[in-house]
Amino acid sequence: MMGSWKHCLFSASLISALIFVFVYNTELWENKRFLRAALSNASLLAEACHQIFEGKVFYPTENALKTTLDEATCYEYMVRSHYVTETLSEEEAGFPLAYTVTIHKDFGTFERLFRAIYMPQNVYCVHLDQKATDAFKGAVKQLLSCFPNAFLASKKESVVYGGISRLQADLNCLEDLVASEVPWKYVINTCGQDFPLKTNREIVQYLKGFKGKNITPGVLPPDHAVGRTKYVHQELLNHKNSYVIKTTKLKTPPPHDMVIYFGTAYVALTRDFANFVLQDQLALDLLSWSKDTYSPDEHFWVTLNRIPGVPGSMPNASWTGNLRAIKWSDMEDRHGGCHGHYVHGICIYGNGDLKWLVNSPSLFANKFELNTYPLTVECLELRHRERTLNQSETAIQPSWYF
């Protein structure tokens, strides 16, 4: 009887061990097969990108650098989608960054941006437009649930193009980020149609060069921008569309005799400046005054950063700071034209814009649409990852390669 019991126990243990080995080897084989397929796709993509740089034309039918969010656990998603999961250098470890990302559509393009800028030492706040579809909201929430250093903004806005809600979305994230335990040095604001042209390490090195100064490119308002803050504007929001209208009512003068500047909505801010913006009465009064202006995110940051004595201020900075590469429709004589198409006067980049983009000194470029011009995004993505890994001081995991 005892011998029979021992025999059964041995048999059960052996079967369990065989099952474990089978499952382990099957998963290992699947991961290796996935990595081999990914490598093949990346190699084909690299050749296609090279041909594009040589002036050839491609019309791909599907994306090469696929992601697997719908059918994966978080671990599988991060491995199969090639996220970098370790800090790549001591320099980057000692200079963590914070990001705000405002999004309302096009999950695929956002996912590529997030994968490109993601590093475990950084922290990410995503503002999800209240008007976004339920499917989009669900996909974003599912993605962010896999990353302990990424989260949704605690306060949400229905964002209107050109309205105060766009600035408020960034401020909502900023409030969450200053409460974060991550000791970030600068916060960079982005939107879901941005893409980085520089690696995380290059961005860190660029920001360190400013020695604690905020980067808010801008000047005194040109003639075409004066009306933005001279007249009262109103946000209109309904179930069909949303927009800002200009009224004939004049605005009161700016608070505290502030000189209003005009600049870019894209900035890089120190933590001390972020706290100033959220707490100082000067900043709070400017925000209140700006609520009925047009596109206040293009005057709010730069106006505060031109005031002497404000933390990290640059009173005479002008357009200093290569934060964003943008092709405006009225500046084709400077950039040579858009090879995609224009929306709101801004180029949605196509394949023919790639050479211009990779030669840009800017940290990021805007705007992209993965579904419309997939190779434009993926050629930049492949180049960005190759350069990221080439700069690494950390042993590279096989899954980090595309």
Curated annotation (Swiss-Prot):
Residues 24-400 are lumenal. The gene is GCNT2. GO terms for biological process: glycosaminoglycan biosynthetic process; maintenance of lens transparency; multicellular organism development; negative regulation of cell-substrate adhesion; positive regulation of cell migration; positive regulation of cell population proliferation; positive regulation of epithelial to mesenchymal transition; positive regulation of ERK1 and ERK2 cascade. The chain crosses the membrane at residues 8-23. Residues 1-7 are cytoplasmic. Glycans are attached at residue 41. Pathway: Protein modification; protein glycosylation. It holds the Pfam family Branch. GO terms for molecular function: acetylglucosaminyltransferase activity; N-acetyllactosaminide beta-1,6-N-acetylglucosaminyltransferase activity. It comes from the Eukaryota. It is an enzyme of class 2 (transferase). It is linked to Cataract 13, with adult i phenotype: An opacification of the crystalline lens of the eye that frequently results in visual impairment or blindness. Opacities vary in morphology, are often confined to a portion of the lens, and may be static or progressive. In general, the more posteriorly located and dense an opacity, the greater the impact on visual function. CTRCT13 is associated with the rare adult i phenotype, in which adult red blood cells are rich in i antigen and contain low levels of I antigen. Belongs to the glycosyltransferase 14 family. This is N-acetyllactosaminide beta-1,6-N-acetylglucosaminyl-transferase. InterPro entries: Glyco_trans_14.
